Amino acid sequence: MNSTQGTVGSDPVILATAGYDHTVRFWQAHSGICTRTVQHQDSQVNSLEVTPDRSMIAAAGYQHIRMYDLNSNNPNPVINYDGVSKNITSVGFHEDGRWMYTGGEDCMARIWDLRSRNLQCQRIFQVNAPINCVFLHPNQAELIVGDQSGAIHIWDLKTDQNEQLIPETDVSINSVHIDPDASYMAAVNSSGNCFVWNLTGGLGEDLTQLIPKTKIPAHKRCALKCKFSPDSTLLATCSADQTCKIWRTSNFSLMTELSIKSNNPGETSRGWMWDCAFSGDSQYIVTASSDNLARLWCVETGEIKREYSGHQKAVVCLAFNDSVLG
């Protein structure tokens, strides 16, 4: 290793993982080598997201969001957003980096203006149950919010109007995602079901309309995450059943099951599959699980290509960005 070691932000591939051991780790995706570890004091990390310009990473934890600089080796957060009373479960960014959105167990989704020197949130959307997940529609104008009561809220940021749907009453919505083409929305819940809708509208003044497409009994245990691939042809679902399943969006049939179940009869569960992210070419997927590992898999064959070992406790979230800015 030479003395002019590059920073995480200079690497064309950013892979970061975090969870219950109060650290965020950065990895060389191809080699499995941990290149940097930053401490995240006082709290587990629930969600990670890289800013659109790849200069910083946001870590959402208990009562705060911390921003770490990817273009230096500074081990401390460069910005702290506080003033939230409970766990922050979800974080993401507007595509041009103007603002950040979060959701949390205080039943609020928030918008934070990243250009403001005032580190207070600018807008709040209140619901009646703790929020597990928030995702920004590709039109950058609607926030999709999933809560523990089983409701999915569509918050129109232009008009401040909102609509809601409840695919399964009193079953917590744990993850929502929209594919890059804005053709489909998926949501997974604690009974292991995955719901898919066709999307129409969402342009100009029109609020997005959701037309039920299918319900997949994806897992027999709690489903924790759903993600569409960048090319919109695949949907991944992660679960407490120790699997991540890959579904074809052409007919929502199962293509591949990625399992961390042990073949040893005496070995108990290796834990939950918490999070996943596809590579930019949709050929690979990284998973985070509570056996302290992240793994890189080949989507087509289900083969493990790399393991990322170093966390001392469960890995519950990751950020994977292999897009090269033009």
UniProtKB/Swiss-Prot annotation:
It is found in: Lysosome membrane; Cytoplasm. One of its GO terms (cellular component) is TORC2 complex. WD repeats lie at residues 1-37, 40-80, 83-122, 126-165, 168-207, 218-257, 268-309. InterPro entries: MLST8, Quinoprotein_ADH-like_sf, WD40/YVTN_repeat-like_dom_sf, WD40_repeat_CS, WD40_rpt. Subunit of both mTORC1 and mTORC2, which regulates cell growth and survival in response to nutrient and hormonal signals. mTORC1 is activated in response to growth factors or amino acids. In response to nutrients, mTORC1 is recruited to the lysosome membrane and promotes protein, lipid and nucleotide synthesis by phosphorylating several substrates, such as ribosomal protein S6 kinase (RPS6KB1 and RPS6KB2) and EIF4EBP1 (4E-BP1). Part of the mechanistic target of rapamycin complex 1 (mTORC1) which contains MTOR, MLST8 and RPTOR. Component of the mechanistic target of rapamycin complex 2 (mTORC2), consisting in two heterotretramers composed of MTOR, MLST8, RICTOR and MAPKAP1/SIN1. Belongs to the WD repeat LST8 family. This is Target of rapamycin complex subunit lst8. It comes from Xenopus laevis. The gene is mlst8.
